[in-house]
Amino acid sequence: PTDKWRSAMTVPRELTLRKVNDDVLLYNYPLKSFERHVAMAYPESVLEILPTRKRIMPLKYGNQSKIQFTLSVPNAQMYFRNKNGDSVSIDVDRDKKVVTFDRRKSGKVDFSEKFAPGVQQMKIPNIPDGPIEIMMLLDHSSLELFINEGQYVMTNQIFPNEFFRALTI
C-alpha cells in the first residue's frame, strides 16, 4: 500500500547470546539508547496484567506507541483495534508453547498476492514458567513483539486504514 517502499523497518537492536537450560539462544532487544526517542503509550511505565480481568488501554500516540507489561499468567490474548473495524490479535499460549499473530483483519491486506495476510505462529519452547516481560512497538506499518527481554521476537507488517486507538489484554 505504499508507492515506493514496503518492507519491515525495525529499531536498532543489541544481540546477545544467553544460555537457557541446555541451549544457547540469540536474544535481540532494542538498544537502551532507543528509549530516549520513545514516549510510553500510557502513564504507567510497566503494567502488570492479572488473570481476573481484561484491561483496555487507550493508545495515546496511536500507531507510534510502545507498550510494555509483565505477564504473570500462562496464556493471554491481546487485541489492537480501531473504530474502522481493523484489528490485530496476538495470543501467547505458554501451555502449548506458541505465540500466534493474526493480521487477517489488520486493514489493507489484499494489495499483493505476495503479502500473506494470514496467521503466523512462533514456537516458544524455552519460555519460563514465571512472569515474563512483553514489549510491543507499534508504528504506522509494523508491530514488533519482544517476549522475555528479546528471547523471542516477532515483526509483522500491518496497514490499518486508521490508527489503532486501544489495546485490550
Sequence positions of predicted segments:
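Beta-rich accessory regions
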Residues: 1-169
